UniProtKB/Swiss-Prot annotation:
It comes from Campylobacter curvus (strain 525.92). The gene is gatA. The keyword Protein biosynthesis applies. This is Glutamyl-tRNA(Gln) amidotransferase subunit A. Heterotrimer of A, B and C subunits. GO terms for molecular function: ATP binding; glutaminyl-tRNA synthase (glutamine-hydrolyzing) activity. It catalyses: L-glutamyl-tRNA(Gln) + L-glutamine + ATP + H2O = L-glutaminyl-tRNA(Gln) + L-glutamate + ADP + phosphate + H(+). The keyword Ligase applies. InterPro entries: Amidase (IPR000120), Amidase_CS (IPR020556), Amidase_dom (IPR023631), AS_sf (IPR036928), GatA (IPR004412). Pfam families: Amidase. Allows the formation of correctly charged Gln-tRNA(Gln) through the transamidation of misacylated Glu-tRNA(Gln) in organisms which lack glutaminyl-tRNA synthetase. The reaction takes place in the presence of glutamine and ATP through an activated gamma-phospho-Glu-tRNA(Gln). The active site is at K56 (charge relay system), S131 (charge relay system), S155 (acyl-ester intermediate). GO terms for cellular component: glutamyl-tRNA(Gln) amidotransferase complex.
Length: 452
């Protein structure tokens, strides 16, 4: 597959040919189910005539059906473009196909999509990760040059790691959330999934920047990262030793090999433990579900989306939500409503926010002394379909990614090895807030060392 860097140098006629070839390949590879159109048999959604970029099904694109992988949004047509889409169009890139996802981005396997499963292109018996599983599978499967996803607790980094591509979550507030269907407003962040680190940096440069339409967008100085990539730069890297040691044997072996390569190249490696990670999962799911219960209250069958049969207004609300939401979404709405309810708000939500502040302080303390943090993306490689049916087990699988969202830091997953089942293993790098340049420099160095 042509890289994004190469595609941006093509003439308009060459881009036209590329789009035709890519569309033919998407139709041929229908079994992968990376795109909603592959699962439904509908024509491929397109906007613009530029370099084709696959778009997760929770990002608004004017005139497209955008459903967030949910039955409740059947029939909804987006009336406007997300800011990220406007930025693509302004740089001669185009929205090209809706990628499958876990319903409302709530999941780690892309098994909860209303449209059906997406397969992992490396091994079809295994999940592609989630919630941006369609975006990662499309890029890794050679049916997308690059893609946009969203990351609330690892939903860009983890599927990219499971499928063997690069997943980049920018600092919270760096990329506008205007036009992103909200799951958890204080955690969600749009970002790129790409074939390599440089392509991820290029796509990030295009979509990043302050946006007055988004109240959570930070007005922080921004300059191009891709133009200044330096994979030769020597960095101080802190390895989270207990996270590496607690990973599966194959993952641990691959991570230690990557650490040795970084050390031999000249990066300074130090080791530390994050001992208080036992609070991460609880804090994340309390905060995320609390925000989700509020954000998803707008889906009532009245204003947009699917409307159920009903005799009165109350019945309309109840029937539309009961029939429209999947089991995982219902579970998280109920949990979020519970933790915000009278008598439990202080016991759960306020404590979770205090834990969040503690988690952020832990990262800041480490990053005061190191340029980057190195740790796993996931404790294991991609599991088989059905193995994550236990909600608690599924929630615990995010243990190495969710704390980064709680802290609002930039992070990236970089492929480093394959296991005996041809499944990918990735390392995760984390940087200080707003220091995407150092993050990309470190990721490029790691990528170069792995590729030899």
């Amino acid at each position: 597959m042509i890289t994004l860097k190469e595609a941006l140098k093509l003439s308009n006629e060459e881009i036209k040919d590329l789009r035709a070839q890519l569309e033919a390949r998407i139709i041929k590879e229908r079994e992968l189910g990376a795109y909603v159109e592959q699962l439904t048999g509908l024509p491929l959604s397109k906007l613009g005539e530029g370099v084709p970029i696959a778009i997760k099904d929770n990002i608004q694109i004017k005139g497209w059906s955008v459903t967030s992988g949910s039955k409740i949004l059947q029939g909804y047509i987006a009336p406007y473009n997300a800011t990220a889409i406007e930025k693509l169009l302004a740089r001669n890139l185009a929205a090209f196909g809706r990628t499958n996802m876990d319903e409302f981005a709530m999941g780690s396997t892309t098994e909860s999509s209303f449209y059906g499963h997406t397969l992992n292109p490396l091994n079809h018996a295994h999940v592609p990760g989630g919630s941006s599983g369609g975006s990662a599978a499309a890029v890794a499967g050679g049916i997308a040059i690059a893609a946009l996803g969203s990351d609330t607790g690892g939903s860009i980094r983890q599927p990219a790691a499971f499928c063997g591509c690069v997943g980049f979550k920018p600092t919270y507030g760096r990329v506008s959330r205007y036009g992103l269907a909200a799951y958890s407003s204080s955690l969600d962040q749009i970002g790129p999934i790409a074939q390599n680190v440089e392509d991820a940096a290029i796509l990030y440069d295009i979509i990043a920047g302050h946006d007055e339409k988004d109240s959570t967008s930070a007005d922080v100085a921004f300059s191009s990262v891709a133009d200044k990539i330096n994979g030769e730069r020597k960095l101080n890297i802190c390895v989270i030793e207990n996270y590496v040691n607690n990973a599966s044997e194959d993952t641990k072996k691959a991570l230690n090999s990557a650490i040795d390569k970084l050390k031999n190249f000249g990066h300074k490696i130090v080791y530390k433990n994050l001992e208080d990670s036992k609070y991460d999962v609880a804090a994340y799911y309390i905060i995320a579900t609390a925000e989700a219960s509020a954000n998803l209250s707008r889906y009532d069958g009245v204003r947009y989306g699917r409307r159920a049969e009903a005799k009165n207004l109350k019945e309309l609300y109840v029937n539309s939500r009961s029939e429209g939401f999947g089991e995982e979404v219902k579970r998280r709405i109920l949990l979020g409503t519970f933790v915000l309810s009278s008598g439990y708000y202080d016991a759960y939500y306020i404590k979770a926010q205090k834990a969040r502040a503690h988690i952020k302080a832990q990262y800041e303390k480490i990053l005061d002394e190191a340029d980057l943090i190195f740790m796993p993306v996931s404790p294991t490689t991609a599991p088989k379909f059905g193995l994550m049916s236990d909600p608690l087990q599924a929630y615990l699988s995010d243990i190495y990614t969710i704390s980064v969202n709680l802290a609002g830091l930039p992070a990236i997953s970089v492929p480093i090895a394959k296991d005996g089942q041809n499944l990918n293993i990735s390392a995760q790098l984390i940087a200080k807030a707003w220091d995407e340049q150092t993050l990309i420099d470190g990721a490029k160095s790691l990528e170069n060392l792995i590729k030899g």
